[in-house]
Amino acid sequence: MRTDKLLYGAAYYDEYMPYDRIETDFQMMKAAGMNVIRIAESTWSTWEPQEGQFDFTHLTHMLDSATKYDLDVIVGTPTYAIPSWLANKADDILALTHDGPSIYGHRQNMDITNPIYLEHAKILIEKLMEVVTKYDCVIGYQLDNETKSYDTCGPRAQAMFVERLKKQYPDINEFNHEFGLDYWSNRINSWEDFPDIRGTINQSLHAEYRRFQRDLVTEFLAWQAAIVDKYRHKDQFITQNFDYEWHDYSFGLQPEVNQYDAARCMDVTGCDIYHPSNDFLTGREITACGNIARGIKNANYLVLETEAQGNIEWLSYPGQLRLQAYSHIANGANMVEYWHWHSIHNAIESYWKGVLSHDLAPNRTYKECSVVGNEWKRIGSHLVNLKKKNRVAVIASNEALTGLVEFPMQSKTADGYNTVLRWLCDALYMMNIEYDIISSHSDNFSDYDYLFVPALYSASENELKALDEYALNGGNLLVTFKSGFSDEHLKIYHDTQPHIICKTLGIKYDQFTYPANVKISFNNVSSDAAEWMELVTCDTAETLCHYDHKVWNTYSAVTLNRYGSGRAMYLGAMFGENTLIEILKDFFKDDSRLTSNEFNARYPVVIKRGINGLGKEIVYLLNYSDKDQSIVNHKSKCIELISDCPIHEGDTITLAPWDVAILEF
């Protein structure tokens, strides 16, 4: 989805304010160069205080005021936090989960398959749409909020799951065989005897239920989109604020949603990206999570939520908020919107601070937002709709993620897959190599010169054959440990590991262990092996380094195979980032276009580039450090857009701490 301007703003909640100050707030937003707000998604109990009694006073107040101040509005459907009167209508509206029955109070605690919930959600959305569709300031709609299945395991959901299995496996014997249910006498000889899924010890069956739960999310969002679509104007978009696996901040692929499938009902991908700041600001999360969002539709995306002040430990240093905003745009976002405008005075998110603090007065954060907004008013037409053509892709897989939740690595945590994903992504980031993140089910592998495959533990034979074909036909393939081990149902393949791609990689193994006192060294850069190691032997591959260990030193840690007209590298263990970077330098060594840039810039200066809507090349120079950084322009003459100054070939560009320069060629 193309837009005619960069969108910059914040979520706004008139219904949370201690007093009516909307005139002051919107005047402040306009002065700060903000042009968009998101409203309505969080307060069903305000819009419908009792069943059938609707009160949209706050809603129309915001819309009328937004019209007055020429602010665009994104309206959220308020279905993720239900009112108490609805929770009391039936015992099964609140979800039954693996942990037991949900209790009213928290958000996202309902069963999204419950027909009573769905009936009332539909009524509310329709009533809301009848109000907002009259306003020209509304540019789009956000479906729900960070939607999940909320681990619904009630009788209804489980019955739906069984019906789905019956359609997939008309022969119940085939089902038992595929899922290995003879083990521990778990065999099911009649669908009517299907046990409660919460008690299963069969990871294949449990993973299948997790897949079913992800599909519930896809169906729920498509159901909402169909309702909204009846009312929206053709120039209004539909989106959703997808989020990520959470490590006290946004980290990686969301385990509970297949976002590639769920986004099909939407015009544009939206996302919520939160990350460390101050001394811990690196830009890694902005890039990795943004790349997931951009890759969902291979298009520009909207950052519907990110931190202004945020959690207590996220308070940014001067200049960082501006750097973060430009980093999102440099990555392909067309919007940066803060959660939220004002810091809330009650309840669980009181210390998740907005642009304004609790005193609601202009502050340092607001002033820095004003710098960003007014710069974007001036130069945004040169930055919006940035198009990227990256040569490196990292594939992502919900099935593999689930597999490593069910069968974790050494640390026994549920985030093993994303740890491996980010291991590769962050090394590329530190090398100033831009990359896409695409689905493992993608049919466009051949669009990329390099394809990275992190821990593809669960993969169908078709997926593995696609990797083989990619390398055979000239691609540069990099595969990590724990790939090609089990099929799409977590049944372990019973031939040479890794299945099918053992020939591609020119290696094999049949034993693995947790590393202890094992090091891996490459180009004199050494680090400890961690999490997992496979005892790899080479068939046609070349060993680049062995394990440094008194016993395991005969086995290969890193290998490279010439295969067809391509190459395939295998990493048999996880190890330190510095060692990984040295190995990647070797993998890329014959590709100077990838490993060098016209500025000889290295991290902490991050380079991002693309083609703008005017057809010109844009290069961002982002200083992720608290020290001045100097970069020499070895390209042709250009314009630095923020200062509107010419930069000639050979000129030195000096970036202040946490500063940014934008070059247009």
Would you name each region that the model predicts?
Residues 10, 29, 37, 66, ...:
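Conserved, mostly hydrophobic/aromatic
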Residues 1-36, 49, 382:
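N-terminal carbohydrate-binding accessory modules
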Residues 99-268, 272-279, 283-285:
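Polysaccharide-binding and catalytic clefts of secreted carbohydrate-active enzymes
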Residues 8-17, 42-57, 103-120, 147-151, ...:
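The substrate-binding groove and active-site-proximal loops of carbohydrate-active enzymes
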Residues 16-29, 250-262, 317-325:
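Short, acidic/polar
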Residues 194, 234, 263-665:
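Carbohydrate-binding surfaces of carbohydrate-active enzymes
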Residues 23-30, 38-98, 224-231:
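Aromatic-lined substrate-binding rim segments of carbohydrate-active enzymes
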Residues 4-6, 33-35, 67-73, 134-139, ...:
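Short, well-ordered coil/turn segments that N-cap beta-strands
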